[in-house]
């Protein structure tokens, strides 16, 4: 059974159909966006019909535009004239889903094909604060269709249909070796040093899955190690309009492990950073959202060699920190404890899913709320309207 997403403009004259809303960036190419637009012929009235793909970086709220400030920058715009089709447009073969939709919807349905360029960022949302309203800041993608005499004509929101999509990346099939780090610390009155090693067995880890952090300690000093603290930091670089860098701790835990002087220690610890434990942190980078609550911590940004970082708008990376709390002893005890630590880079992503082709010619259409006539931004929540519509 093929699932199809449908969105209709508020006047009911124009609908857009897409077979999916997540499009995978394979680093060297991005999956094409193929869909169908259904239009009322009386509404078209000899005008042209366009489909537009927009990638935008939003770093402020729409309500601030009234004071003359624009907090949105279009990073990429691609337009296809669907009706009448331009003679110079390349003839792209129809997909199986497009053929089924055209057969189902009739003569007033038209196919379209859009292709993202490879140097665009992935969808990222910055978690809003509790009092924030409107669209969240971040990188978003939108497919829009409208009828007009030409592209310069101003089209109201109620006369166009817009559907938010996501550009995503999956973990590489053949990841590299796991990271490793070491530090050596010498203390006053100790003839031998303290050596800390930390490593992970894998380069890439998956959202929601435990991350194994291996710790090895050679304590040749006369100091006692009281605790091991492991934390995971998310680093968000906003590189488009400024050089802002935000570091937020998404996981932290202290493990009580007493390591005596002149002894060794080795153990593997499991840590799992989750959005559920960080839902109150404003500005935390998340994977782009389609519905309320359907996202997770942002995936690590995978850069192609030679790529211009500025075009990406927002870069997301992670690091694991391992710190030892070393007691210096004496009458002050832990008040004079010293911190010894190392950092490991962490790549956090989703695994590549298996490709399961639809085994049936049936089409299930999931329809989304229309934009309100007042021009207000439409809801991105799906209606519970899954059914074999239009058959």
Curated annotation (Swiss-Prot):
<dbReference type="InterPro" id="IPR000698">
    <property type="entry name" value="Arrestin"/>
</dbReference>
<keyword id="KW-1015">Disulfide bond</keyword>
<dbReference type="GO" id="GO:0007601">
    <property type="term" value="P:visual perception"/>
</dbReference>
<dbReference type="InterPro" id="IPR014756">
    <property type="entry name" value="Ig_E-set"/>
</dbReference>
<dbReference type="InterPro" id="IPR011022">
    <property type="entry name" value="Arrestin_C-like"/>
</dbReference>
<comment type="similarity">
    <text>Belongs to the arrestin family.</text>
</comment>
<dbReference type="GO" id="GO:0006897">
    <property type="term" value="P:endocytosis"/>
</dbReference>
<feature type="compositionally biased region" description="Basic and acidic residues">
    <location>
        <begin position="369"/>
        <end position="379"/>
    </location>
</feature>
<dbReference type="InterPro" id="IPR014753">
    <property type="entry name" value="Arrestin_N"/>
</dbReference>
<dbReference type="Pfam" id="PF00339">
    <property type="entry name" value="Arrestin_N"/>
</dbReference>
<keyword id="KW-0716">Sensory transduction</keyword>
<dbReference type="InterPro" id="IPR014752">
    <property type="entry name" value="Arrestin-like_C"/>
</dbReference>
<comment type="subunit">
    <text>Homodimer; disulfide-linked in response to retinal illumination. Interacts with CXCR4; the interaction is dependent on the C-terminal phosphorylation of CXCR4 and modulates the calcium ion mobilization activity of CXCR4. Interacts with GPR84.</text>
</comment>
<protein>
    <recommendedName>
        <fullName>Arrestin-C</fullName>
    </recommendedName>
</protein>
<dbReference type="GO" id="GO:0051219">
    <property type="term" value="F:phosphoprotein binding"/>
</dbReference>
<dbReference type="InterPro" id="IPR017864">
    <property type="entry name" value="Arrestin_CS"/>
</dbReference>
<dbReference type="GO" id="GO:0002046">
    <property type="term" value="F:opsin binding"/>
</dbReference>
<keyword id="KW-0966">Cell projection</keyword>
<comment type="function">
    <text>May play a role in an as yet undefined retina-specific signal transduction. Could bind to photoactivated-phosphorylated red/green opsins.</text>
</comment>
<dbReference type="GO" id="GO:0001917">
    <property type="term" value="C:photoreceptor inner segment"/>
</dbReference>
<keyword id="KW-0844">Vision</keyword>
<dbReference type="GO" id="GO:0007165">
    <property type="term" value="P:signal transduction"/>
</dbReference>
<dbReference type="Pfam" id="PF02752">
    <property type="entry name" value="Arrestin_C"/>
</dbReference>
<dbReference type="InterPro" id="IPR011021">
    <property type="entry name" value="Arrestin-like_N"/>
</dbReference>
<dbReference type="GO" id="GO:0001750">
    <property type="term" value="C:photoreceptor outer segment"/>
</dbReference>
<feature type="region of interest" description="Disordered">
    <location>
        <begin position="369"/>
        <end position="391"/>
    </location>
</feature>
<dbReference type="GO" id="GO:0045202">
    <property type="term" value="C:synapse"/>
</dbReference>
